[in-house]
Amino acid sequence: MQVDRDLDKVGVHCAIKDCNLLDFLPFICQGCQGQFCLEHKEEKEHKCPTPIVKIGGTTVTCDKCESILPVPVNCFEKDILSMHLRKGCPKKTTVNQHKCSFCPKMESIKIVCPNCKNNFCIKHRFERDHKCKPRVNPPLQQTISPHLQNLLSQLRNSKPVKTNS
């Protein structure tokens, strides 16, 4: 039946193979990131390989992606870091995405000069600070197609039309 197949796309099946219960609001384990049903949401219920550190635990920060990783009790930081790197350490995301047109600095906000229309950092945002050279707009005649120019000239040369008002 088509409706049954559509419902499979809405929820997520419990990660426990013997359970495989379809859950519309699954629980995500903070340790292993698996998705589980209500019965298997606890770390001990699904035998979590990387349980989250509760009281008295520590964390370690990955130097490459700056992720904070929990270190379970009776585990070593170096083992957690090496496992994190093996799983595929995500690239560090940068907030600063707008490059200054005058220097190599990046900014988190876009600062566009109204005169030259280039992007700049806070230090070079004023025209005098980035040696602004305004963009020259081409004359209107150059931007209009020849066909449109012909129509405009015909309109200019035509006699006004009288209307009854």
From Swiss-Prot:
Q: Which GO terms describe its cellular component?
A: cytoplasm
Query: At which positions is Zn(2+) 1 bound?
Result: 14, 19, 37, 40
Which SUPFAM superfamilies does the record cross-reference, listed alphabetically?
AN1-like Zinc finger
Positions with a binding annotation for Zn(2+) 3:
100, 103, 121, 124
Q: What Pfam families does the entry give? A: zf-AN1
UniProt keyword terms in alphabetical order: Metal-binding, Repeat, Zinc, Zinc-finger
Could you say which residues bind Zn(2+) 2 here?
29, 32, 46, 48
| Gene name tied to this protein | zfand
- Report the GO molecular function annotations: zinc ion binding
Which PANTHER family is this protein grouped with? AN1-TYPE ZINC FINGER PROTEIN (PTHR14677:SF41), ARSENITE INDUCUBLE RNA ASSOCIATED PROTEIN AIP-1-RELATED (PTHR14677)
Report the transmembrane regions from the record: none
Q: Which PROSITE patterns match?
A: ZF_AN1 (PS51039)
Q: What is the organism field in this record?
A: Dictyostelium discoideum (Social amoeba)
Indicate what this protein is called per its UniProt record. AN1-type zinc finger protein
Query: Cross-referenced InterPro entries, in alphabetical order?
Result: AN1-like_Znf, Znf_AN1
Binding-site residues for Zn(2+) 4, renumbered to this chain: 113, 116, 130, 132
- Residue spans annotated as Zn fingers (AN1-type) read 8-56, 94-140
